[in-house]
From Swiss-Prot:
Gene3D superfamilies: 2.40.30.20, ATP synthase alpha/beta chain, C-terminal domain (1.20.150.20), P-loop containing nucleotide triphosphate hydrolases (3.40.50.300). Belongs to the ATPase alpha/beta chains family. It is found in: Plastid, Chloroplast thylakoid membrane. GO terms for cellular component: chloroplast thylakoid membrane; proton-transporting ATP synthase complex. This is ATP synthase subunit alpha, chloroplastic. Its EC number is 7.1.2.2.
Length: 507
């Protein structure tokens, strides 16, 4: 029979009493007054911070956006269908943040950085705040390195530098996303990490972009952040900041990044929906008063960091959709004033078969030739001038039938230059190929060809020069200058190919 020893029992009880730690946790809680349309009104939560995450009893997370005298307005990061009036809510004491790591490359994630591509969890040891302050003046340096898009019209006349913010603006179906995805494809082998943020788009459109990047091996250095049209407004509003946080992670690790926001009009609409439901006073076009700050705090995070911080960079290409070419609407004017230039895509040019449909006349880069290599500067100046003169003459020629020979020649040259700016989608050109193409056009080598023959000739010329005059590309790649030697190789190559092409066409 087991004997019960009182001293042993009392010792065990004493030990337990000594080990007992009386912990008091204070939780800031509140009660749901009203819920609906992705918004909840909470009574209580007295010490909640603006932008703090709050957790509902059934697990939904929300963000406290409106701090009013008698209640707190919370936007929900989910449908919130299970939230009931009178249920409890607790403040988490955290501001929205996401995990970040190299493992995100090649993945498709949502605004909360959770994978949505069905390829399992993403391991990450660090995290970053979704909203973090932009680098200050001392932390930056001026933009000086080119970020090649692979599109002749942009790289020659509207150059983009690493750390710049260049707006892509145009009506729907004018090729805005195509310009952005071509730029991602052209970063292959350039040591640039790309982040593509899809806001409020059709899931089929996002899938198309991802497939096109995968087929060409571009997903290896790309992260896709997607919140489709059926996502809650809160997540559509957060998606660009999530993308920026991921790009910043790489930028502060001395790497170059490119981020595309497709598109900010949809983000502004999601924010307008949230603000109106929170009963914030509407302003112009019913947008809230702080919609400028919504975009400025996002785009100011793009920067070229100083040498002390490792010279990393984050280049932003925000996309904005206009309604029938109206760039004077509220969101377009806001974003134009925040960015360092804009690429304007025109529906008329697109329908006329000029693709990419870039209106060179009103597109501008405020960084300019600082973001070009010397060889490109040498050939691009003449191209700009001749196209500007051609645009003027073309408008004038519509009213006049008898034009002198010089004017006719200039019009013919302009038509051929316009032809050389045309490019197929997903076929970006290297900077050496662009230089040889522009040089051929501006020096009159295309004048003897029919307009319909120009593109065929240029394709053959690029192949011919690559195989028979590799010295040209080597000189440009090493010196970044169109030297006299490189020019002589180029002239010989063009001359030889032109003779071959004309013979071939005669047969």
């Amino acid at each position: 029979m087991v004997t019960i020893r009182a001293d042993e029992i009392s010792n065990i009880i004493r030990e337990r009493i000594e080990q007992y730690n009386r912990e008091v946790t204070i939780v800031n809680t509140g009660t749901v007054l009203q819920v609906g349309d992705g918004i909840a009104r909470i009574y209580g939560l007295d010490e909640v911070m603006a932008g703090e995450l709050v957790e509902f009893a059934e697990g939904t997370i929300g963000i406290a956006l409106n701090l009013e005298s008698n209640n707190v307005g919370v936007v929900l990061m989910g449908d919130g269908l299970m939230i009931q009036e009178g249920s409890s809510v607790k403040a988490t004491g955290k501001i929205a943040q996401i995990p970040v790591s190299e493992a995100y490359l090649g993945r498709v994630i949502n605004a909360l950085a959770n994978p949505i591509d069905g390829r399992g969890k993403i391991s990450a040891s660090e995290s970053r705040l979704i909203e973090s302050p932009a680098p200050g003046i001392i932390s930056r340096r001026s933009v000086y390195e080119p970020l090649q898009t692979g599109l002749i019209a942009i790289d020659s006349m509207i150059p983009i530098g690493r750390g710049q913010r260049e707006l892509i603006i145009g009506d729907r179906q004018t090729g805005k996303t195509a310009v952005a995805t071509d730029t991602i494809l052209n970063q292959q082998g350039q040591n640039v990490i790309c982040v593509y943020v899809a806001i409020g788009q059709k899931a089929s459109s996002v899938a198309q972009v991802v497939t096109s990047l995968q087929e060409r091996g571009a997903m290896e250095y790309t992260i896709v952040v997607a919140e489709t049209a059926d996502s809650p407004a809160t997540l559509q509003y957060l998606a660009p900041y999530t993308g920026a946080a991921l790009a910043e992670y790489f930028m502060y690790r001395e790497q170059h990044t490119l981020i595309i926001y497709d598109d900010l009009s949809k983000q502004a609409q999601a924010y307008r929906q949230m603000s109106l439901l929170l009963r914030r006073p509407p302003g112009r076009e019913a947008y809230p008063g702080d919609v400028f700050y919504l975009h400025s705090r996002l785009l100011e995070r793009a920067a070229k960091l100083s040498s002390q911080l490792g010279e990393g960079s984050m280049t932003a290409l925000p996309i904005v959709e206009t309604q029938s070419g109206d760039v004077s609407a509220y969101i377009p004017t806001n974003v134009i004033s925040i960015t360092d230039g804009q690429i304007f895509l025109s529906a008329d040019l697109f329908n006329a078969g000029i693709r990419p449909a870039i209106n060179v006349g009103i597109s501008v880069s405020r960084v300019g030739s600082a973001a070009q290599i010397k060889a490109m500067k040498q050939v691009a100046g003449k191209l700009k001038l001749e196209l500007a003169q051609f645009a003027e003459l073309e408008a004038f020629a519509q009213f006049s039938s008898d034009l002198d020979k010089a004017t006719q020649n200039q019009l013919a040259r302009g038509q051929r230059l316009r032809e050389l700016l045309k490019q197929s989608q997903s076929a970006p050109l290297t900077v050496e190929e662009q230089i040889m193409t522009i040089y051929t056009g501006t020096n009159g080598y295309l004048d003897g060809l029919e307009i319909g023959q120009v593109r065929k000739f240029l394709v053959q010329l690029r192949t011919y020069l690559k195989t028979n005059k590799p010295q040209f590309q080597e000189i440009i790649a090493s010196t970044k200058t169109l030297t006299a030697e490189a020019e002589s190789f180029l002239k010989e190559g063009i001359q030889e190919q032109l003779e071959r092409f004309l013979l071939q066409e005669k047969l």
